[in-house]
C-alpha cells in the first residue's frame, strides 16, 4: 500500500525518525538513515519526541474509535428495541434507555449523590462544591440551591413524606432542611470527628442515622438534634448507611471490606457480611418484589430451599456486586461485569432488575433472575458516582465526577 505524504510531511517524518534514533542511542542506524534520507546533522528542536507523541495519540484515537463504535452499536440496537412491538413491555420491565432525557449542569465540582423526592417531581443533587441543588426531573429545570455546608456534601436523604431533607458533609456536620416552605437549614448536628459520609432517616422520621470516616454510626433525634446512640464495630471509614423499610434494622458498609447489619433499637450488630475483597462503597435494600427473582437466581447455586430475606445488595471497589440474605448472613449471588469500582446501586421497583453506577463511566442494568448484565449505558464522561430509581415514575437519575446530573427515561 502506497503512503500518500507530501514532500513537507515526508521531510518532517524523516526529522522525527532521526530524533527518535538519536535520543535512543541508535548511532549507527542514525548515521545510515541520515545519509539515505539526505538529512543535515542537526535535528530541529520542534521534532524532539514527536514520533512518540504521534504514536501515543494514534493509540488514543484507536481507543476512542472503538468506544464510539460500541456506542453506535448500542444506539442501533436501541432503535430496534425501542421501536413499537407486538409484545409491549409492562412498566415492571421498563429499564433506562439512552440517550438521556436531560443532562443538567450547574454544579462546580463532582456530584456525590442524586436522589428523587418521594412525592413531588423533584430530585436533589449533592456536590463537592458544598451545595445541594433541587431540580424538576420532568422539565429539567433548576429550582434552587441549598447553601450552608462549608465543604463537600457527601450524602442527602428525605424523610418518608419528603418534608425534611438531611445532608451530611466533610465539614463534620449533619444538617436538616425544611423542604416544605422555607428551604432553610433548621438544625445542624455536630459530633463526628471526621468526614460524615452518609445519612439516612429511620422510616418513622423521628431519627436520623449518620456514618463517618471516624468509624462510627450515630443516631440523632430530629426534634432536638441530640445524638442518642453511637454504634461502633467497623474498623475503618464507614461509607454508607441505609435503613430497611421496616425500620428495625439498618446496614452499613466500610473500607474494612465488610457490611454490618445492626438492630436499630439497640447498639448490637446482628450480622457481619464478609466476602468482598476491597472497600464496600454502596449498599441498597431489595424491595419485597425482588424476592422471587433473587430466590430463583440463588436456587441454581444452593439447594437450601427458599430464602426469606431481607435481601441487601452491595457494591465494591473489587468491581463486583453481591446480594445477601441478611437473616442468615449468606451471599446468594455475585454480579460481575463492571471494569472499575461500583459506586451506586438502586433496585427497580418492580423487583426484576438492579441498576448500578461505576467508575467505568457506565450504568449497568442487571437481570436478577438470570444473574446477567442485560444493558450497559455509556452514561458519563467521567466516573459515575450515584444512581437512583424512582419508585413510581419511569425515571432513573445519575450523577458523576463530570459535574453533570442526568435524567434517563425508562421504557
From Swiss-Prot:
GO terms for biological process: axo-dendritic transport; axonal transport; border follicle cell migration; brain morphogenesis; centrosome localization; centrosome separation; chorion-containing eggshell pattern formation; clathrin-dependent endocytosis involved in vitellogenesis. It holds the Pfam family LisH_PAC1. Positively regulates the activity of the minus-end directed microtubule motor protein dynein. May enhance dynein-mediated microtubule sliding by targeting dynein to the microtubule plus end. Required for several dynein- and microtubule-dependent processes such as nuclear migration during cell division, mitotic spindle formation and the removal of mitotic checkpoint proteins from kinetochores at the metaphase to anaphase transition. PANTHER family: WD REPEAT-CONTAINING PROTEIN POP1. Its main location: cytoplasm. GO terms for molecular function: dynein complex binding; microtubule plus-end binding. It comes from Drosophila melanogaster (Fruit fly). Belongs to the WD repeat LIS1/nudF family. It is found in: Cytoplasm, Cytoskeleton; Cytoplasm, Cytoskeleton, Microtubule organizing center, Centrosome; Cytoplasm, Cytoskeleton, Spindle pole; Chromosome, Centromere, Kinetochore. WD repeats lie at residues 106-147, 148-187, 191-230, 233-272, 275-334, 337-376, 379-411. It comes from the Eukaryota. InterPro entries: Dynein_regulator_LIS1 (IPR017252), G-protein_beta_WD-40_rep (IPR020472), LIS1_N (IPR037190), LisH (IPR006594), PAC1-like_LisH-like_dom (IPR056795), WD40/YVTN_repeat-like_dom_sf (IPR015943), WD40_repeat_CS (IPR019775), WD40_repeat_dom_sf (IPR036322). Dimerization mediated by the LisH domain may be required to activate dynein. Expressed primarily in germline cells during oogenesis. Low levels are detected in the germarium in regions 1 and 2 and in both nurse cells and the oocyte in stage 2-4 egg chambers. Enriched in the oocyte during stages 5-7 and in nurse cells in stage 8-10 egg chambers. Ubiquitously distributed in early embryos. Expressed throughout cell bodies, dendrites and axons of the mushroom-body neurons. Residues 56-83 form a coiled coil. Interacts with dynein and dynactin. Does not interact with Paf-A-Halpha. Residues 9-41 form the LisH domain. Keywords: Cell cycle, Cell division, Centromere, Chromosome, Coiled coil, Cytoplasm, Cytoskeleton, Developmental protein, Differentiation, Kinetochore, Microtubule, Mitosis, Neurogenesis, Oogenesis, Repeat, Transport, WD repeat. GO terms for cellular component: axon; axon cytoplasm; cell cortex; centrosome; cytoplasmic microtubule; dendrite; dynactin complex; dynein complex. This is Lissencephaly-1 homolog. Changing residue 128 to K: In Lis1-23F2; induces lethality in second instar larvae.
